[in-house]
Amino acid sequence: MIIKNALVYTPDHTFVPGDLAIRDGRIAADTTPQPGEEVIDAGGLYALPGLLDIHFHGAVGHDFCDGTEEAIQALADFEASKGILAICPATMTYSEEILNGVMDAAAAHKNGRGADLVGINMEGPFISPHKLGAQNPAYLHLPDVAMFRRLQKRSGGLIKLVDIAPEEECAFDFIAQCKDEVRISIAHTCTSYDTAIAAFDLGASHMTHLYNAMPGITHREPGPIIAALERKAEVELITDGVHIHPAMVRFTFRTFGDDRVILIADSMMACGLPDGEYSLGGQAVTVKGPRATLTEQPGVIAGSATCLYDCMKRAVLDMGVALESAVRAASENPARSIGVDADYGSLAVGRYGNVILADKALEIQSVIQKGVRIV
């Protein structure tokens, strides 16, 4: 396949008028059309790399923690239709027994149709009881190396991220023992600046949904956010227009840099569906517009109802983030953060030929997966 006359997002994070070639499913250097080769005239559309969401829970009525092939395939199909061509869905805080079923289903899944399943983000249960967000307190568990390793074995090595509250008992031991086995993210935490610094120095390298479910910044208690800034951690941002004020989104891109920000959806099963009553982690959720909240605690946000592509689009059109930065934060950065950037996250030669063609309003005109047009 040849894509002609596009504004191509290059590995240098700039847009350049040009052509793309996809052969044997991967980006090729020679853009000269071969006899009989499919040629698409992009007519000046943006050519963006396929996105990668490393933190979302569900969509279109399904949740990753359903622990079924039906759910995984439904999520893969929906995400791909939105230009998200690789996924690393997140678990919720559940018992090991329930998580076993999720890991078994993920391990059995075969990539083919829809977004590629490239990892699992284990968001619970090693978190603080005081910063639960929409996590279920009934299933909280202290950080447990043996439990993690059992789950990782069942998943076939798919767990790429484990979330942890570093102030909890056993957390430092977990970080020290597991830092070379999985990426460790600080999340759902009451941690102080000093404890967060110590956790990063031990081997944590990531921060889950920055600003949400953690202490804020003050001049006497700088907290984990400043620790993440100083220790060069990668940080997730939910740019759905509900979780974070646009000024804070711009602030984060300026201070952390667009090489360290990772856009995520953190979406739940209502994403792609009308307003109504849903569930997340065994708790009732009410969705109205882009806002999802616990039904019994309307002040508690319960994930988002927005997919990653629309979060990226909103960051650009509504929040003042440069398109080049937002694309990087939704493609290259998440791919690198979970170690799959040799195949995903950019339009460099040798990467999978995953391309989104979008107009100047960032409306998707076509989605191409490994050289096959799927939208």
Regions found by a protein language model. Give the residues of each.
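Active-site gating loops and adjacent loop-to-helix segments of metal-dependent hydrolytic enzymes
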Residues: 77-88, 128-156, 200-210, 221-234, ...
